[in-house]
């Protein structure tokens, strides 16, 4: 998925090391590195399920077949001088996966019988009881939507959910529909998956998005990005009537095959509302089971713990409350609470034959990418941007005599995102009066330091504006010398 490989090009610019990846992930990473002109300088080694890789004298990594929402998902059994560490990666226990490749539970059990020192397990759905539904169950729901539909069908899902796309492909073939693809990430993913053989379909099934006007509605399926209501995504632009290629009409059935990620609920609701106002029929997870999670719920997590029988348990991949819930599940499975270790990003865990203990911390956290800049946008810059977005900006421009300290011209007031100057002339006049008053006070106190004058103007003007408007714009005084 993008959240796993998106940072690879930026990481490689700092540390150029070999990449080990399953075939599909390797293909997607190659595409990404090619965009960044890093492909020739990077070594990518494709790995296979069941393979064991030797790393130096003391370590080896066994690749164990897993199941998730993307093909080629794996767990890693890392053999060290003090024992084996099993890392689940993202997983669910799906007994009817779309590609027929069931998780290798037998190998996990074998390793458990041999002795697993530590289990690091996916905690995303640790708060949810029961089992996660199989990916194939979504296909059954889709079939019921497709079978009698005479409308054009638009399906929004995560670009990397290849199993979901395969099910849409199967139904398009079954019901005689062509498929067009919208959204750059979706196009790239499907092209790569088809090229590598992860999507099985007739050669002529997919058509260019420019060709949709030559087919009747009942002959078309459009697969698109935008299931999270992202502002510039294809589905959002369709819902707003801004998409250049696709115009939504009342003769469309739109299926949003994803649950909103926490924080995206308002964006998704807005897209659904916009689509419904156009008159389109909209089906989403609150109305039908058109999405299932790719992560294990409590009973699947218990199964892995039971098979692995680890000495130490380390819940990973989740918010702290989810790590806590997973830790509680491990306690219920009989793991000693002293051997359950909750870690935060950057903490170092040292394990030897006798004990496991948290030691020091290393630098970790977000590295923000802003245009061509990587890591040069910090908390102060983000705070300023948030401030500007909420209350706007006022710039005070003064020209002062460098010898006498007298105001030669101004003050002039420039406002952006605070008030419309022409409609707030009285307030602008008051602002100028406050600035003149503060400058005069500085003159009387014989303050000639520009930094002090700016600070005085800024602080007093800030108090005045808040008193008058209950808003707190960013204030930037600019003093020019003559």
Residue ranges of each PLM-predicted region?
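His/Asp/Glu-rich metal-coordinating catalytic cores
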Residues: 1-215, 233-247, 266-270
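Short glycine-rich phosphate-binding loop at a beta-alpha junction
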Residues: 18-19, 314, 474-476
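Conserved hydrophobic residues forming the short capping helix/wall of the S-adenosyl-L-methionine
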Residues: 33, 330, 465
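Conserved beta-strand scaffold positions in the cores of enzyme catalytic domains, especially
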Residues: 44-46, 118-120, 254, 282, ...
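Broad gene-expression machinery/nucleic-acid interaction feature
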Residues: 58, 73-75, 219, 391-395, ...
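Hard-cation-handling environments
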Residues: 127-257, 261-430, 434-446, 454
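C-terminal tails and terminal domains of large nucleic-acid-associated
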Residues: 446-482
């Amino acid at each position: 998925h993008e959240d796993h490989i998106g940072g690879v090009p930026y990481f490689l610019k700092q540390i150029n090391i070999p990449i080990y990846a399953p075939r599909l992930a390797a293909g997607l990473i190659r595409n990404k590195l090619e965009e960044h002109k890093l492909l020739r300088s990077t070594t990518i080694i494709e790995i296979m399920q069941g393979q064991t890789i030797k790393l130096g004298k003391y370590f080896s990594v066994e690749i164990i077949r897993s199941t998730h929402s993307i093909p080629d998902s794996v767990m890693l059994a890392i053999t060290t001088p003090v024992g084996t560490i099993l890392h689940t990666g993202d997983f669910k226990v799906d007994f009817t996966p779309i590609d027929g490749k069931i998780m290798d539970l037998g190998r996990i059990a074998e390793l458990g019988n041999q002795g697993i020192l530590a289990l690091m397990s996916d905690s995303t759905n640790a708060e949810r009881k029961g089992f996660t539904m199989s990916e194939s169950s979504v296909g059954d729901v889709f079939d019921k939507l497709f079978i009698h539909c005479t409308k054009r069908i638009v399906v929004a899902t995560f670009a990397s959910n290849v199993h979901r796309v395969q099910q849409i492909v199967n139904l398009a073939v079954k019901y005689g529909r062509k498929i067009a693809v919208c959204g750059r990430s979706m196009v790239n993913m499907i092209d790569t998956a088809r090229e590598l053989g992860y999507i099985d379909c007739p050669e002529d099934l997919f058509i260019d998005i420019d060709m949709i006007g030559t087919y009747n509605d009942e002959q078309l399926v459009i697969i698109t990005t935008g299931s999270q209501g992202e502002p510039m995504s294809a589905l959002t632009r369709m819902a707003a009537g801004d998409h250049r290629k696709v115009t939504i009409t009342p003769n469309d059935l739109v299926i949003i095959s994803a649950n909103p990620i926490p924080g995206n609920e308002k964006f998704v609701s807005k897209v659904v509302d916009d689509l419904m106002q156009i008159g389109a029929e909209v089906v989403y997870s609150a109305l039908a089971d058109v999405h299932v999670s790719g992560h294990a719920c409590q009973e699947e997590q218990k199964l892995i713990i039971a098979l692995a029988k680890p000495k130490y348990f380390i819940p990973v991949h989740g918010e702290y409350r989810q790590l806590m819930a997973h830790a509680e599940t491990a306690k219920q499975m009989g793991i000693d609470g002293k051997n359950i270790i909750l870690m935060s990003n950057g903490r170092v865990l040292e394990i030897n034959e006798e004990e496991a203990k948290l030691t020091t911390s290393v630098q970790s956290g977000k590295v923000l990418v802003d245009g061509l800049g990587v890591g040069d946008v910090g908390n102060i810059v983000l705070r300023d941007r948030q401030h500007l977005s909420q209350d706007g900006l006022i710039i005070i421009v003064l020209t002062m005599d460098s010898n006498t300290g007298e105001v030669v011209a101004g003050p002039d007031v420039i406002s952006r995102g605070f008030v419309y100057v022409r409609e707030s002339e009285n307030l602008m006049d008051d602002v100028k009066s406050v600035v003149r008053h503060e400058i005069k006070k500085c003159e009387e106190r014989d303050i000639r330091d520009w930094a002090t004058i700016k600070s005085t103007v800024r602080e007093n003007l800030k108090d005045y504006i808040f008193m008058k408007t209950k808003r707190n714009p960013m204030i930037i005084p600019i003093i020019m010398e003559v």
